[in-house]
């Protein structure tokens, strides 16, 4: 690690501590337990021979987007039972009816605590999760699957690890990124797993979520269980010429999205690529088409239009 990067890390840590202290001083009732507005069975009956997926979703306009339905459909086709956990303000009757066709349970909860509290709510509302052979924690922060996903359960189960993610990150502490975390049976039955989610609290400071819960999950569970990423940062960097490699630890889904797709047929694209890096939909569509993706970017039209509107409003 270079001296420059070490200094940057120290500065970020100090900023984090200052922001966390400020958040703690200003926080009042934000830590109250989020209200569960709705929790009912879907049209599909649970199948305890299948792994369960707890899928967290949020939309500013309280719409379940086409790309979310596509992801849910692919999860179901791959062999997952799905519990849908929404933190949007509401779920329309039309969406409830459509979601029921993909899910064994649909939950609507107050928007507090980000995804880790959403997954905690899912575990509380569907305590039968431990009867399934495995558990996937997933969310709609990604677009996809971009390529064939039918064998994903086999790939996860065949991986020589107890907890399997798509990608890893080295910020704060080496950890698996939480947008896709698969836990095998011994993990979900363990005291460590149960204890971790028991102590999850409402935290409204996003970087604290990453540090305390995303990195903290790997740090705690890694003391007993083996962790692995299907598309590890080391593996991705090996495919990039040395001079073109980032000179610091980075988020591979954000900085290396293109080589992930072109070299590995990576099944997901982080939404933040389009919202924060300002990569155009046309560029993404071209990369996907050139690499034989089956993902229809046409289903993103309404979502991309919303991003453009928010950008115009924010620039005024």
Pin down the residues of each PLM region.
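ER/Golgi luminal nucleotide-sugar-dependent glycosyltransferases, focusing on the catalytic module
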Residues: 1-316
């Amino acid at each position: 690690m270079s001296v420059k990067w070490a200094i940057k890390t120290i500065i970020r840590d100090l900023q984090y501590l200052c922001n966390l202290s400020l958040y703690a001083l200003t926080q009042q009732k934000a830590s109250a337990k989020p209200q569960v507005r709705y929790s009912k069975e879907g049209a599909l009956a649970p199948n305890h021979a299948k792994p369960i997926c707890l899928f967290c979703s949020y939309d500013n306009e309280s719409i379940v987007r086409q790309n979310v339905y596509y992801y849910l459909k692919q999860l179901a086709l791959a062999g997952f039972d799905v519990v849908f956990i929404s933190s949007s303000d509401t779920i329309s009757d039309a969406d409830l009816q459509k979601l029921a066709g993909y899910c064994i349970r649909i939950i609507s909860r107050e928007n507090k605590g980000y995804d880790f509290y959403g997954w905690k709510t899912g575990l509380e509302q569907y305590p039968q999760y431990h009867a399934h052979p495995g558990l996937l924690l997933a969310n709609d922060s990604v677009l996809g699957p971009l390529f064939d996903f039918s064998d994903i359960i086999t790939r996860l189960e065949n991986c020589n690890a107890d907890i399997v993610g798509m990608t890893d990150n080295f910020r704060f502490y080496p950890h698996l990124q939480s947008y896709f975390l698969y836990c095998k049976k011994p993990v979900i039955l363990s005291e460590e797993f149960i204890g971790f989610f028991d102590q999850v609290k409402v935290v409204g400071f996003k970087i604290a979520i990453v540090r305390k819960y995303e990195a903290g999950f790997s740090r705690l569970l890694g003391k007993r269980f083996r962790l692995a990423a299907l598309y590890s940062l080391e593996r991705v960097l090996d495919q990039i010429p040395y001079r073109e490699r980032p000179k610091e630890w980075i988020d591979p889904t954000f900085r290396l999205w293109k080589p992930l797709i072109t070299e590995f047929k990576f099944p997901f694209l982080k939404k933040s690529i389009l919202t924060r890096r300002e990569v155009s939909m046309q560029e993404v569509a071209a990369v996907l088409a050139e690499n034989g993706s089956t993902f229809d970017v046409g289903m993103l039209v309404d979502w991309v239009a919303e991003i453009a509107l928010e950008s115009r409003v924010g620039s005024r």
